[in-house]
Curated annotation (Swiss-Prot):
Encoding gene, per UniProt annotation: rpsQ
GO cellular component, as recorded: cytosolic small ribosomal subunit
One of the protein's GO biological processes: translation
Organism from which the protein derives: Mesoplasma florum (strain ATCC 33453 / NBRC 100688 / NCTC 11704 / L1) (Acholeplasma florum)
Family: Belongs to the universal ribosomal protein uS17 family.
GO molecular function, one term: rRNA binding
Keyword Repeat: no
Protein name: Small ribosomal subunit protein uS17
Leader peptide range in chain numbering: none
Length: 85
């Protein structure tokens, strides 16, 4: 898999309790095929955070990678926006 063909997603960190792992909530919008209304879909991804820089509430960018564990297929690219606490 080429580096530029990997999926890159932007989402919000909802959990950082695991060691070197964050849970990222990614929200997407799709048009309903019949009613043509925009419907919001959300999905959680587990991502590898080697330096443990991401905290809850941060907006982050994650990239698809080889499987790192049973459920972890993404890694943290960068923190786009820090959470305001």
């Amino acid at each position: 898999m080429e580096r530029n063909s990997r999926r890159i997603l932007v989402g919000k960190v909802v959990s950082d309790k695991m060691d070197k792992t964050i849970t990222v909530l990614v929200e997407t919008y799709k048009n309903h095929p019949i009613y043509k209304k925009r419907v919001k879909y959300s999905k959680k991804y587990k991502a590898h955070d080697e330096q443990q820089v991401a905290k809850i509430g941060d907006k982050v960018q994650i990239m698809e990678t080889r499987p790192l564990s049973k459920t972890k297929n993404f890694r943290l690219v960068k923190v786009v926006e820090k959470a305001i606490l």
